[in-house]
């Protein structure tokens, strides 16, 4: 009752809404990745879980969208004949913030991975509250990058489980400084 009239009812109802939002976003992302995999259309989706990514964190910040997250929009953004298909899509919550984003590449596994996988590793090495879904254009293989490590190959149902787990562990309200941790010094050679 103390919260009535304070504008703070989100404390009471916010977590249910956030859980529904997370569940909805996980479903959309898993379905879109699964469909991209089936048709062997490459994709790269960055999930900001509180890193507060800024345009200067990318080689090219892409085109700002601020659009509702949906399977159809993700499939269209990664269509081969569209100008944004080669870059990453940046997602936060249930919003697609931007598309055509060019990510910094990892220096690990240069001979083992393609550009999409190196980009996924690169962004997740630098920001610990960030995940990256990768769909290989060549094989249709799904991968998930987290903290500079790739889990692959995975199924779309495994992806859904991993995303649900990561969202459950993500802090509900991240502070600006908490998520910004740079974990790789690009001047040092990686073994």
Task: Identify the meaning behind each predicted range.
Residues 1-191:
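Divalent-cation
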């Amino acid at each position: 009752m103390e919260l009535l009239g304070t504008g703070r009812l989100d404390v009471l109802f916010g977590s249910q809404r956030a859980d529904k939002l997370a569940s909805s976003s996980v479903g959309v992302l898993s379905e879109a990745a699964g469909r991209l995999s089936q048709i062997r259309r490459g994709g790269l989706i960055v999930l900001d879980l509180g890193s507060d990514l800024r345009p200067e964190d990318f080689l090219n910040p892409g085109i700002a969208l601020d659009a509702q997250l949906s399977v159809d929009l993700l499939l269209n953004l990664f269509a081969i004949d569209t100008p944004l298909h080669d870059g990453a899509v940046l997602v936060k919550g249930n919003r697609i913030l931007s598309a055509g984003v060019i990510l910094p590449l990892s220096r690990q596994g240069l001979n083992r991975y393609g550009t999409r996988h190196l980009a996924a590793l690169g962004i997740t090495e630098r920001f610990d509250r960030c995940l990256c879904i990768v769909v290989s254009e060549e094989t249709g293989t799904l991968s998930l990058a987290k903290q500079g490590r790739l889990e692959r190959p995975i199924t779309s149902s495994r992806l859904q489980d991993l995303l649900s787990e990561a969202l459950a562990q993500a802090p509900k309200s991240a502070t600006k400084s908490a998520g910004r941790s740079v974990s790789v010094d690009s001047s040092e050679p990686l073994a």
